[in-house]
Amino acid sequence: MTITPVYTTFTPTKTPIKFFMAGLTFLIAHISHADDGRTDNQEPINQEIATLEPIINHAQPELLSHDALTPKIEPILAQTPNPAEDTLIADEALLLDNPDLLNHALNSAVMTNHMAGVHALLPIYQKLPKDHQNGILLGYANALAALDKGNAKKAIDELRRIIAIMPEYNVVRFHLARALFMDKQNEAALDQFNKLHADNLPEEVRQVVGQYRQALKQRDSWTWQVGMNLAKEDNINQTPKNTTQGQWTFDKPIDAITLSYQLGADKKWSLPKGAYVGANAQIYGKHHQNHKKYNDHWGRLGANLGFADAKKDLSIETYGEKRFYGHERYTDTIGIRMSVDYRINPKFQSLNAIDISRLTNHRTPRADSNNTLYSTSLIYYPNATRYYLLGADFYDEKVPQDPSDSYQRRGIRTAWGQEWAGGLSSRAQISINKRHYQGANLTSGGQIRHDKQMQASLSLWHRDIHKWGITPRLTISTNINKSNDIKANYHKNQMFVEFSRIF
């Protein structure tokens, strides 16, 4: 494909914004980063808590973009390129010999937001002698190219330089506001969008600006999550299948109807330069109507300070947790968590966390523990309808007064999420862990305890089945623990329909 230049000069006004803002979609995506799978082993009957996502709660990315509430520009171009071609081929020698032609060609590509043309012509334009270059045009083309490649910071620098020279040009101001939005500089982005909104804009442009302003307000609004499921759960007391082993006799496995619930709220307050502070609260647990001594309820409060831009989100959080087991106070936990969410490129994302905590056991004071978790995940998005996750974890629990309860756990996990044709969606997850304890106990035959654990789940839902913003999900899960400690061998299955909503 060759370039047909449009002979106009680079004199942006308020009207060219119509050309590149003709098409608009409003894309909403949510990545639920659930808990990272930290398991408290200091429980009566060694029961592991599973909330609404009972198996691999390390990272639950939804499909599509990681950023939420991001309007997406789909411009109408002055030319109609061949859909089979991704790039434009330009005669570099011809254009360098004709600086006016090159200026007009790049100007045409910039003013129509024709990114293939901008990417093809910009490297050639940069080879022109300085006295043949238009500095504003060069900066604007650099900014658009940087935005197209996701380099919001470079685009912001270029666009701020231009807007300082030409503050009345709203087409430039719009791209500056959009770059600030991408870089999560929320206060600065809102300031630019407010200036645009106050001007005399065409109605279609005003609607786009309004959607960005609304998206920015929602970034700082309260987010609520409510969910519950009712399930028939087997072996809630997690006892061995064989209740008599040698001189030991164990309770029979108990099957029960389990109500699992979760309620959460969180909020961020944006600060300058992409910084923010946040607060969150959660309650979750399990209720067994006919076996209340196995009821398990948790509450958590957290406050965090962070920094986010288009590529990364860095956060440090302090939190406190309270747990009640069988309606009695069981444990208190205080901790600090550091996390890094980094978008490597549009296809890959990494999630990393370090969590250090102190647990106080009110039922068994000698079981107080110091805990450390290291967690990392890599997510691959081959397209907008699929993702794959691979993760690894290391958890160290030290119980100073009882080495037999101290252990280290190493694990790997994987997940696959898919949107199928016809509206069906699925998520499959599996994790494999090994625990190595520091001491022996009576039921391990005097040997140091070693456990192998496998957890797996499959969730299915239909995207067209929803009511009041709730899409029911069918989940089947299994949890197998094999140990040389005879009381720690168990196998339990669950099947339930989950109802949850985020708003």
Swiss-Prot record:
Protein keywords? Cell outer membrane, Membrane, Signal, TPR repeat, Transmembrane, Transmembrane beta strand
Ranges: TPR repeats: 136-169
Q: Does the keyword Signal apply?
A: yes
Principal location class: membrane
Q: Which Pfam families match?
A: SlipAM, TPR_Slam
- Output the superkingdom of the source species: Bacteria
Among InterPro entries, the record links this protein to: Slam_C_b-barrel (IPR007655), TPR-like_helical_dom_sf (IPR011990)
Cellular component per GO? cell outer membrane
Which intervals of the chain are annotated as region N-terminal domain?
38-220
Tell me if Protease is a UniProt keyword of this record: no
Subcellular localization, as worded in the UniProt entry: Cell outer membrane
Signal peptide location: 1-34
Transmembrane parts of this sequence: 222-232, 259-270, 275-285, 299-308, 313-322, 334-343, 348-358, 372-382, 387-396, 410-419, 424-434, 454-463, 470-479, 493-503
State the residue spans of region: C-terminal probable beta barrel: 221-503
Bilayer topology term: Multi-pass membrane protein
**Protein's job:** Required for correct export to the cell surface of some cell outer membrane lipoproteins (tested with TpbP) upon heterologous expression in E.coli and probably also in Moraxella.
What does UniProt say about this protein's domains? Answer: Consists of a soluble N-terminal domain and C-terminal probable beta-barrel in the outer membrane with 14 predicted beta-strands.
Can you tell me which family this protein belongs to? Answer: Belongs to the Slam family.
Name of the protein: Surface lipoprotein assembly modifier
